[in-house]
Structure formats: C-alpha cells, structure tokens
Amino acid sequence: MRMQRRHLLKNAAAALAALGLPALPQWALAAKAVGLRRLGQPQPFDYAWLKGRARELAKAPYKSHKQVLPGPLEALNWDQYQSIRYRQDHALWADGNGKFQAKFFHLGLYFHTPVHIYDIVDGKAQQLAYDPAAFDYGKSGLGGKQLPKDLGFAGFRLNTRKDTERDFSAFLGASYFRAVGKEGQYGQSARGLAIDTGTGGPEEFPDFIAYYLEQPAADSNTVVVYGLLDSPSIAGAYRFAITNGDVLLMDIDSALYPRKTIERLGIGPCTSMYQVGENDNRMDWDWRPEIHDTDGLAMWTGGGEWIWRPLCNPPHVRFNMFVDENPRGFGLLQRDRNFDHYQDDGVFYEKRPCLWVEPKSGWGKGSVQLVEIPTVDETFDNIVAFWNPQAKPQPGQELLMGYRLYWGAQPPASAPLAHCVATRTGLGGIVGQKRSHFSWRFAVDFAGGELAALAKDPKAKVEAVLQVSRGTTEIVSARPLHELKGYRAMFDLVPPDEGTQQIDIRLYLRANGKPLTETWLYQWTPLAASERKN
C-alpha cells in the first residue's frame, strides 16, 4: 500500500514497542500446552513452491489485503491494544521438546492487514486458525464472543523455551521485523523491501501476507521462517534462517517479481531513529543528552574502503547516495555504548542493537542510500538505509537477492584501521580572540588500530587528510588524545557564502602515506545568515 511515511512509521514504531510488554501471569506461563486448531489438510511445501506462488501472484492485478476490522478492534486505543497478550499455553511448539516457541499478535489499532500463518512439519504446511481463546484480552474490554472465528493474525514473535517472557525476534506490520542480541533490547527494525523511499512522492510499504514457520528439530539453534510478500508494485518469496545467539543471525534468501518498473527499490532496508547526538541538535527542552537508536552508517565498499557516516537530524529531508559495486557490507550501528551519554533508564539506548547487512554474493553496481528525515519525536523512525541496484527491476523479471543480517552490540566485520568514536561540532574560532568571520568547528575522535602506539611516540607524524565540497578549512590539526588511546582531528569550516547549501566533508588520518583510520564522511548544512555568530 502507499501512504504518508511519517504516519505509518510513527504508528509502527509505537506499536513495535509492544515487543517489550510485561509477561503473562505465572499461572498462564505454567499452564499445560493446548493444541492449536488448524484449517484444511497439510500440503507439501518448500521454497520452490513459495517462489512459484509469488511469481503467479505478480502476474495478477494487485488486490489490497487490508480489511475492515470489527468495530471494537477499530476503536481500541494504544493502552487497550497493548494489554492484549497471546497465552503461553497456546504457543506454537509449546507441546514439543525443541528450544523455541512462537506466539502471535492480535489484529487491531494500526494493524488491519491479516496474515495467514502456517506450521510446517515434515515438509507439509497447514494453516493455523485464529482462536479468540488463545488471547488474554486484558484491559481491552474485548472478549472472544465479540470477534469472528476467522479473523486472522497480525504477526508473530519468537522466544526460547527457557525464557518465555522475552522474545528475540518479531515480525509485525507491513514487512517490518526486529531482533535482538544478548543485550535483549529492541531498537531499529528491518524490512522485507523499501519502495520509493526518499523520492519525494508517496512511499510504498509492501506487506508480508503469509508466514510459514518450520518446526525446528529438538537440538536445532535455528528457526526457519518463510514469508510471502505482496504490494502494488511487486511480489516476493523470502526464506529466513534465524539463529539465536549473542549476535543474532538471519540468513535471508529472497526472490522478487515486479508487477511494474520500480523507481527506487531498496534491498536490505534498515529503519532507525536519530533525534539528537553529540554532533548536532542539542535540545534545551529534553533532560537527556542523546536520543538515538543508532548513531552512524558504516560501509565496507567493494573496493575495500571502510566508511563511517555519522547520522544527523537534518533541518529538511536529506538524501545521500554512496555509489559502489559488489559491496561487502553496510549497516546502521550504535557505537556509543555509554549509559552516561543517554541517561535513560527506561529505554536504554546504549543497549540498542547494531544491524549489519552482508551480501551473500555479488550485488553488482548500485548504491547504498541513506535517507534522513527531520523529527522532534523519538517514536518516529526517521532514518532509512538500503541497497539500491543500478538496474531498475522490470515486470516479468526474477530478482534473486541473498544476504545476512547480524543483530547485536557489534557488527561481525570491522576495519583493521582505527574507527571513529565521536563527532562533535560547534562554533569555530580561537577562544579569547575576536572572530573576524563565521566558522564551524568539527572535532572527530578516532581510536583503535595503530593509534594507541602512535599516541605514545613523540616522533610520530600523524596528519589529517581533509576535503570539502565547498568553502575553506582552517586550524586543521591531528593530535594524540590519551584519554581515548587515540587521536582527535579538529578543523574549522568556513562556508563560502551566506547560503545554506549542504557541504560534503571527507576526512581520515594517515602517517607516512598510509591510512590509519576509516574514512569519516559528513554532510553539514550551514546556519542561516541570521543565526551565525562572529
């Protein structure tokens, strides 16, 4: 479906907070497992069949899957919807001896598109029936007798048998899904696809309309989930192999079948929130120093360069394209892990997971694209990053894309070079001296690699290599920062005029002609002339 992105994402972000709801009472957790009601007869199933189903779906005209919900569900407010919980005694696989269980989300509030959910056992799939008795309706005011027996589900969540109170992955709303590492704290989301994100026109949000959950073997650490995706522009078949661990791994295969030419197709989209950080938008009205799920976009290019692009909460929608060929990986990371930098003991931003996208094969020519949208609300996901193939998919074409998603405190791959640990900005000039002109100060801290040893060497000649697309730089330096066992690069940027046209900045440290750090990229919007201080 197509709709205004701000409306959908704000609702989705708030609703996904339901993933952290308190558990059911202990009597429900301890109840004997109840067999789930099923529909029809088991049918042979494999990924090839699902790809065929998606291919046939794409050949037919699109029909919306959204439905009008019964009045009581339409009328739910957030607190009422939040109180509806799936009963532990009805969990899928609760009566088995495997390591995992699945529970389901109820339709209502923002979720009007029912998804069909199937259980796969011994290569055969059978649809699970919606059962009002499987839900505790809490303070919603609803009861099973008010709802139809064929209502359907909104999505599902996965948990381990050892910890039924906390889920480690959840699929809910459009094509959104989330996961956590050992920190157990949800943060950013992924999506099956992004369509026409940042084009200036309406964005299309595909829906997963069916999920097929394969019963894991008793000793397996992996849950395999299949998804059927549909939208006005495309249909697709997905296979997720989800391996729980300190860093949760999703091994994903997708087969995409366009109905029409897509202007901007986003593969492996990451969706996050950045409101305020060390580098911009200090807010006098909020008591917390920083508010963000992630603080930067990391890229490992096909040519082997490591790039770090700090995120911003821009004054207007900002779109960046990083052209590449066969990228080795990219992702939105939360590098700042210091509680003191956030001071939020309710949502714990310092525990939010990084999300790293690793192609399983060559993706060819294209670009990593970053969209940053202004926000004054931390419940609005305003950051999106994805891979956009250079060749636009055409109707009748099959596009096969395989990749891995890693969710955890650290990405699986990192540069052998030093990496950026902080970016700070403010008014430039020399303290104590009258400013003759306006300039903006940048202080960029690097740590790791060879920097700790070089910081102790008085003969080391470390220099900042700096480029800007407009304006001039002054007071450029690179000096040891012993508190970090690293270096701080510092410079002032003087805009060329009184305009607010963006300026691109590129920086890294080197010694003896050899790079010492990853490449730091930044896009700065100069202050309006009326806001500048000399």
Swiss-Prot record:
GO terms for molecular function: carbohydrate binding; catalytic activity. One of its GO terms (cellular component) is outer membrane-bounded periplasmic space. PROSITE patterns: TAT. SUPFAM superfamilies: E set domains (SSF81296), Galactose mutarotase-like (SSF74650). It is found in: Periplasm. Residues 1-30 form the signal peptide. Belongs to the OpgD/OpgG family. Probably involved in the control of the structural glucose backbone of osmoregulated periplasmic glucans (OPGs). This is Glucans biosynthesis protein D.
